[in-house]
Amino acid sequence: MTQSIVHVAVGVIIDDSGHVLLGRRLKGTHLAGYWEFPGGKVEPDETVLQALDRELKEELDIRIGATSPLIDVKHDYGDKQVWLDVHRVLEWQGTAKGVEGQPLAWVGIDSLSEFQVPDANAPIMAEVRKLLTSV
C-alpha cells in the first residue's frame, strides 16, 4: 500500500534576541510531547505561504509578513510520510500564544539540545543552529 505524503508548511520564527519559537505537541496527537516548529498541513487549494499564514493564525494568533525559504525535508516515519516545506518568518504581527493550549518556548542556541524534536525536525534544527550562530 502506498502512503500519501503529507505536505506541511513550517515556520521558523526567531525573535530580536536570537531565540527561536517552539511549540509542544499535545497529548493525543502524532508524536505527542515532542517540541516542534509551528505550522500545519497545506490544503489542496492553498499555496505554502497561505497555509503557513493560516496555521500560524490558528495556532499562535499571529499573521506573517515577509518570509524566506529555509529547507525542504522529506521524512518517512513508517506510519506516515511528511514533506516539511520550511520558511523562515522574517516579519510577523501579534504576540505568539498557544491558542490550542500548546505550551510555547522561545529557545536560545545554548538550550536547543534540551528540547526533544521529531526526527523530521533534525535537519531544521541544524539550519536554525546556523542562523542563531550568525545572529
Question: Would you name each region that the model predicts?
Answer:
Residues D15, R63, D72-T95, A105, ...:
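Active-site-adjacent beta-strand/loop module that shapes the phosphate/pyrophosphate-binding cleft
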Residues M1-S4, R129-V135:
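Generic C-terminal helix-cap and adjacent flexible tail
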Residues M1-V20, K41:
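Conserved N-terminal beta-strand and adjoining loop/helix that marks the start
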Residues E59-A66:
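Short secondary-structure junctions
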Residues R88, K97-V128:
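NUDIX/MutT-family hydrolases
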